[in-house]
Amino acid sequence: LTGRTPNRAGVYDWIPSGTKTHMKKNELTIPAMLKTAGYATCMSGKWHCNGFFNRKEQPQPGDFGFDHWFATQNNAAPSHENPRNFVRNGKEVGKLKGFSCRIVAQEAGKWIESHVKKNPDQPFFTFVAFHEPHEPISSPKSMIKNYPRAKKKGEALYYANVENMDYA
């Protein structure tokens, strides 16, 4: 988002939920720069830039230049399937049906379609960050069956997880 390594942006390790660690609000981000050039901006997916997600104590996606955002702090929970921890523009969404990668892609696609319809001449930027293939892995059973030569069940789950992103 900044074009810099995490260390240069003040993030030195992974960011567990409920910690003071976060990307500093004064970081210049690509969406913030594009907004100054007249772009509309959207973020959909994993927002792993703070420990206090969707709380005023730390900056949120909208503070970094996103007009529309649909995200989780870290992973889709309780798993990639039927997640319940998404937030849209500061409002909790509740339990969703389906796999996270497809939900994230659909949200971005709907935003793009709506934006182009309402503002056909305005350029836009969409940032999509899938949760997959991060653990805990959950994949469609129909895709797991595509990998009968996998040596372990975990391998088939992983391959199906990547395939599911391809179809998102």
What label would you give each PLM region?
Residues L1-A168:
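Formylglycine-dependent sulfatase
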